[in-house]
Amino acid sequence: MTLRARPHLHYAPVSEGVYFNGPRTQFVISGPQLLYRVADTCVPLLEAGTTEDELVTALGSERARPVVRRIVDELRARDLLLDLGALTVPEPSAEIRARYPEALAHLETECADPYAVFQRLRTTEVLLCGPADVLLPAARGLHRAGVTGLTLATPDFDAAAATTSRLGLRLLPLSDSASLPDPGDLPVPPDAALYCPGADAGVTPEALTALLPEGALLVPVRWDGLVAAVGPAAPARASLPGSAALIGRAARWAAADAAAPAPHPTAEALAGALAGQLLFDTLAGIAQPGEAHVLHGEELTADQVSLVAPGTASGEAAERRFLTAAPAAGAEPVPPPTPDEAVEAVTALTGRWTGPLALLGGEELPQMPLALRETADRDGGAGSVVAWAEEQRTATVAVALTALRAACPTPGAAAAGLTEEHWLLDGALRLMADEAVPYATRAVGAVEARSEPLLRMLEEEGMPDPALTLLRHPGLDWTLAEVRTSGGPRPWTGRSWGRDDTEAVHGALATALARHQTHGVPGAGPLADGVHTDALLFADASAQAALRKQIADAAAAAGLRYEGTPRRPDPVTGALPLWSGGVRAVPLDGEPQAAEESAEETAHG
């Protein structure tokens, strides 16, 4: 069998043997110093294409065969060799290779059957629609890569004429008022399209699908005053909504960052080149699913982003979820994520350009005795919010959940959680807080050691001896604590659930103090109104299961159950890694109860 090394295979001697490096892997084959001499003979021959027998012959001894076989086996195991005999299409001629060296090297690096892919791309028909500043760089790149079946439809006929004539491309003139050609004007049916709507961003997927076969690939290029978005590459019904959502989200990020606009016409040229490369890679089957690019800044930076579910329809119906005493029969229990997993989920929500939330630096927010974190909305909603925790990692998770609650539509209690169970429990606790009954009212008095710094800070700020009310819901063994301060710049209130009195009091004290500290920072967002439920973050699976049963049993005794409607998938990133949405109490026959957590709950400072 004839083997050829994929491009970009490098090797070097190391003390343990020979180091090899490929596009996506690196490893060491251990052995004596002589092993490098063997590799130094074999690798150049493999780059040209050779057989095992020819490698052994080049080394001059049959005794070298085991070593040759070992090197070959290690390279094949890491997909660094092509078996030319197993390919469905033979390698192209020397003339074709000389004409398209970069494209062939790219396909040989990435594809299992590179020459079959290249042959298919050579016969692909691509329609490019939009301004010449965008289309010409894309057309040149695609033509240079071997995709020569190109039709350009542009209102800039004169600007495109010389290039299209030189490259032998088809050119269709568009009027200034048209962004798409008439289907009858196309000389050949396109297999894929690149579309830059320019000022006309209102073209529907239906209009584009009239030009393209069912499921044909589309790469959009969109502009905003500050940024440009390239991609995602997908059928028009997904790609157009996905790109519209991406450019809107990226524009809000750029505006919030006070970014300078991308320079023209350089930005158009780069956007076109990136769009052409994305179209080529997607047709070849080597682009990452949902790959897109955002161009921004005076220095014109292009950031690659990923759209997990391009163009997810915002109108998709969300399936209602119910908090039952136990998971449904056969349902796999979902353990709470680890702290690192929770932070990773928040990171997915706050990625620049694509995330609906932005984690702010918070340099002005106090960090003692509590850690305070702030997030800003990047989804067209209102402002920013702050949350507290004992340390930064938990505060990062807490503020993301707070922001998701702030974005919840009515009706119901706005709730969020790390899992479906956590989200429903969060909503139920918020609703049940209004039903909790006081059983003790006093000054806070003595507290556990971790709460003492909170009391000292309140006293230093002129708010000593806050009043405490302890409450219980008849069906729960959790405690609800309410702390009210007096003195200072204004009174503050903190309400918090806890697994016991101590935890609830600590949460209420911390909430009241965090309200005071946040209020003193100019420009900072507010601490969210409502009851603090972050004790759920520290409740393990068994504690959550016990609470779930208590809540479900208490609701059933009242002829109710708790129902949640999860947030729909995000139009940019797809399904969110955290749960959120409205939770409400409904009668067991399914009709919502009139009494829900008030949207106008009394502000707590």
Task: List where the protein language model places each region.
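Helix-coil modules at protein/domain termini and other flexible surface or pore-lining loops
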Residues: 1-35, 39, 52, 57-65, ...
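Short helix-capping/hinge SLiMs at alpha-helix to coil transitions
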Residues: 44-49
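Beta1/beta-strand and adjacent pyrophosphate-binding region of the FAD-binding site
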Residues: 124-128
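Aromatic pocket-lining residues of Rossmann-like dinucleotide-binding sites
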Residues: 142
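NAD(P)-binding Rossmann-fold cofactor-contacting core
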Residues: 149-169
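N-terminal glycine-rich dinucleotide-binding loop that anchors FAD/FMN and/or NAD(P) in oxidoreductases
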Residues: 164-180
